[in-house]
Amino acid sequence: MENNTVKFLPDKAKRIVLFCDLRNSTDILMDFEQDIYSGIESPGVKAFTYAEFIMDVHETSYKELYLGHENTYAEIYGDGVMGIFPEDNAKYILENIYRLTKRMRTYNDSPSMGVFKPRIDIGFGITAGEVSFIYYPLDKRHHPVGRCVHEAARIEGISRLYDARVLISDRFFKFAEGYIYTDQRFSYRFIDRIILKGFREPITLFELLIDNDPRFEIKKNSMKEYSEAYSMYCRREWGTAAELFQKIYQEYGLGIGSVMAKRCDVLSKSPSNPDWNGIWNMKDK
């Protein structure tokens, strides 16, 4: 899929890059193959298929994220969608994500979900950086090129690890923080400082919190304890940090607490590093 009206620029220009991806897509596909969601067929009416399901997910994502806009580049990757936006579109992107996540919650709250159709969960990764568009004669299409394209994909790929739905880089946060602070529908929480797999420079990650998430208040209420635990983690107080992270997991039910507690255990058994600065080097995508 290519938006033929977008202004493809061969020179680098600052853009916002968004990846959103359907989680558990392989499990959903296998469930369809086992006719778990086939429902009841009636004369002239076929059962709901995986092809129809994934098309509906893509079409809804495309429409709610408004990827057909003339200044937006959009492309479908398997069960996910990438959108590339002008750098001044931060507020516009927040509104679009809000609509899509609200639509997703309405869909999942339907009594028929899990019976005739699968529940869905979509993860997001967003960053900002320089992008150029290169024309490929092989498929006669323009394709985006830029480090931030890979960065957004990596961020989305680890969003589930942190129990985060919308994971964003500090680069995108700088564009969006003014809107986040002034709109009560949104908030954010600090997540981590890491080096993404295949990258060389550290990045700071935040989760964009949205009030249509059932755990919106839970995540906001956990931020003070998480900040305390993370400070101890940075000071190499592994035992105390692990206990606090584990408490976050147990009391708030947030997976990030368990992830960070296990990381502290690994670090406590590793040789002491005098240059430790709290930055974790990711080994997985």
Residue spans for each PLM region:
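Catalytic NTP-binding/metal-coordinating core of nucleotidyl cyclase/transferase enzymes
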Residues: 4-95
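Intrinsically disordered, low-complexity, charge-biased linker/tail regions
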Residues: 273-285
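Amphipathic alpha-helical transducer elements in NTP-driven molecular machines
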Residues: 51, 94, 146-152
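Conserved, well-folded catalytic cores of nucleic-acid-processing
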Residues: 100-103, 107-110, 151-162, 179-182
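A residue-level structural signature of the nucleotidyltransferase/glycosyltransferase Rossmann-like core
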Residues: 17, 123-124, 165
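Catalytic core of nucleotidyl cyclases, primarily class III adenylyl/guanylyl cyclases
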Residues: 63-92, 108-147, 171, 199, ...
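Cytosolic regulatory/linker segments at or just downstream of nucleotide-handling modules
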Residues: 160-238, 246-247, 252-263, 267-273
